[in-house]
Amino acid sequence: MEGLLIALIPMFAWGSIGFVSNKIGGRPNQQTFGMTLGALLFAIIVWLFKQPEMTASLWIFGILGGILWSVGQNGQFQAMKYMGVSVANPLSSGAQLVGGSLVGALVFHEWTKPIQFILGLTALTLLVIGFYFSSKRDVSEQALATHQEFSKGFATIAYSTVGYISYAVLFNNIMKFDAMAVILPMAVGMCLGAICFMKFRVNFEAVVVKNMITGLMWGVGNVFMLLAAAKAGLAIAFSFSQLGVIISIIGGILFLGETKTKKEQKWVVMGILCFVMGAILLGIVKSY
């Protein structure tokens, strides 16, 4: 029971980042920079308490991973501007799950048993269906939704997904570091990536400083993800962490005023259910 409660914390922490950042405001580049500053602050605090051994390879690959992460996060913030948080977040999370699972299964042979392929392919099918319903719009309302530039949103989700999957593959399949040790080099890389997106014009504006809270939320989610994996197992921790899309959808509608027609509300619920079932199945696949 304790493990399940701990697993809820990453779900809420990561799932809230999108609507909290958009409630604070700022351009995507400012949101990314503010978030990475918060992550760097969190990483420094962790390092002061843990003081792990820091090797050259840890710094090099940690910084590289952080830069890749910043590409993913910046693209996600861009997509939120085009599509809204309640649409962009589930699409981004689903794309990462599908892409990451396929890379893991086909390139790194993470699926070796028949049951893994059966459950894994079923999960991916559910996630794709979830994609469809989460982004489906009421045709009668499309003329009123000119501010939601979905084509640009899908393009930004595409490069965001490449960034996130590359970062995940680097840390999970190529270089395996202690999470508490690599968090500082990674946070440095995240900041460097964010500064590149700002074209090296660094301004510590109020909106940037306020967005640091999302970086702290990211850090808290990471720590409790590790604790949940230790207490309840990786399958539970992974599945629960992916359910943050529910929080982002609800948060976008309640706190950002993103409107949905009755048809779209039904489609969103169907999409959420598919995401939940798909994420749980992928968690089960990881347990084999």
Swiss-Prot record:
The record lists the membrane-crossing segments as 4-26, 33-50, 55-72, 85-107, 117-134, 154-171, 181-200, 207-229, 234-256, 268-285
> What start and end residues bound the annotated signal peptide?
none
Q: Which GO terms describe its molecular function?
A: carbohydrate transmembrane transporter activity
| Recorded GO CC terms | plasma membrane
Q: Which keywords does UniProt give here?
A: Cell membrane, Membrane, Sugar transport, Transmembrane, Transmembrane helix, Transport
The reply to whether Transmembrane figures as a keyword in the UniProt entry is yes
Q: Where is the protein situated, by its record's location annotation?
A: Cell membrane
Q: How does it sit in the membrane?
A: Multi-pass membrane protein
What is the protein's major site of localization? membrane
Task: Report if keyword Cell membrane is assigned.
Answer: yes
Q: Which domain of life is it from?
A: Bacteria
Its family remark reads: Belongs to the GRP transporter (TC 2.A.7.5) family.
PANTHER family, alphabetically? TRANSMEMBRANE PROTEIN 144
Protein name as it appears in the record: Putative sugar uptake protein SAG2157
Species of the source:
Streptococcus agalactiae serotype V (strain ATCC BAA-611 / 2603 V/R)
